[in-house]
Amino acid sequence: MDIIQKSIFNSGPHSRGIYEPPLGYFTPYNTPPYIAAYSDSGSWLADHHQHHQQQHQQHQQQMQHIRFPTPPITPPRPIAGYGYRQRTQSVIMKARGQQDELCRSPVEFPDDSKSCSSSSECGTASDFVCNWTDCDRVFDTLDALAQHVTQRHAIASLTDGLYYCRWRGCQRSERGFNARYKMLVHTRTHTKEKPHRCHLCEKSFSRAENLKIHIRSHSGEKPYKCSFEGCQKAYSNSSDRFKHTRTHSMEKPYMCKVAGCQKRYTDPSSLRKHVKTFKHSIHLIASQPLTLPSVPCLLEASSESAFTCLPAASSVESTSSSSSARYYDDSNNEPSDYSLKPKQDAEFSPSYWLGDRQHSYLHSEDFFVKMDVESPLDLRIHRI
């Protein structure tokens, strides 16, 4: 406070402690102080700084509320009086009311699903029984059963330090695991626990590695590339890459055992797929008792995919009459009628056909199959 201001403050009518500056004293560049009673000449300046500090703190708290709009659990300290406290309290009560409404509202499930929070909680009481030796405890949820097995039975043996699975009926109860996590993964085959769930679909897995491989089916990631020079193929798991690398070598130990088929494969799964094809899976099942013996024959039809062969009979008694039958093709699920009739002076040389859409034998006997409209005998062809 300058000399003029002190003199005015301490003399004349202003000696009572009320500061009233002269007219025109303040300029646009001077901020007027609070007009109040002061016991000390510098106390008004300290209160003025404190007022600005409170305004600055209030501004920071408002900016923080804008940056993080989630209302706090407890009401904040009142800053600007009763009005501000009342507004803050109303916001908190509104947020709590929404949370209570969410907690009280029942969860709706589709008609074809069970009303449980997770798949691990679905099931009856008999599904969550501990079949460990000398333990028959029943649990309400699968999570409780898994936690019981983990805490109670996953204990190392005192004799050799290995972890043994004592689940009733386990085939490797006498072969211990050298690590605790390995036994816990194994026990999931008994408890049916699948804690690793895909966040993109509804599938769950018992091992984290299987979930990691499954997620690659969503992302399209194929980190396992073929090491053969010039091959650009890649796979999502190492087992598929191993099957592929054997195609570059001549090693094909799995051979088709169907007579006349020379196909060989590098892995048993490919051989099983080959055997299940239409070429090797034709089975003729008579819906009526056979009155005539089955004879080797040739199916004459307009479609190449209709080629097949009836099984040969051990003896042929009578071949003068004809017998009708019906042929079912799995490709179109439409029946075709044909009849067995003798054909005189037929000369067929034994041979074997293997094409893309036909797989049949030709024999030298004097019978063949001709498409017809008669159908008293029902012979069906089924896939394996």
From Swiss-Prot:
Q: Where can this protein be found?
A: Nucleus
GO molecular-function annotation terms? DNA-binding transcription factor activity, RNA polymerase II-specific; RNA polymerase II cis-regulatory region sequence-specific DNA binding; zinc ion binding
Positions of the zinc fingers (C2H2-type)?
Answer: 128-153, 163-190, 196-218, 224-248, 254-280
Print the keywords alphabetically: Developmental protein, DNA-binding, Metal-binding, Nucleus, Repeat, Repressor, Transcription, Transcription regulation, Zinc, Zinc-finger
Q: List cellular component terms (GO).
A: nuclear speck; nucleus
What are the inducing conditions?
Strongly and rapidly induced in larvae by maltose, trehalose, glucose, fructose or saccharose, but not by lactose or galactose.
Checking InterPro entries in the record gives: GLI-like, Znf-C2H2_ZIC1-5/GLI1-3-like, Znf_C2H2_sf, Znf_C2H2_type
Q: Where are the annotated segments for Disordered?
A: 321-343
Q: Which domain of life is it from?
A: Eukaryota
Example GO biological process: negative regulation of transcription by RNA polymerase II
Which PANTHER family did the record assign? Answer: GLIS FAMILY ZINC FINGER 2, TRANSCRIPTIONAL ACTIVATOR CUBITUS INTERRUPTUS
Q: What is this protein's function per UniProt? A: Transcription factor which represses a set of lipase genes involved in fat catabolism.
Q: Identify its protein family.
A: Belongs to the GLI C2H2-type zinc-finger protein family.
Know the name of this protein? Zinc finger protein GLIS2 homolog
Whose protein is this, by species? Drosophila melanogaster
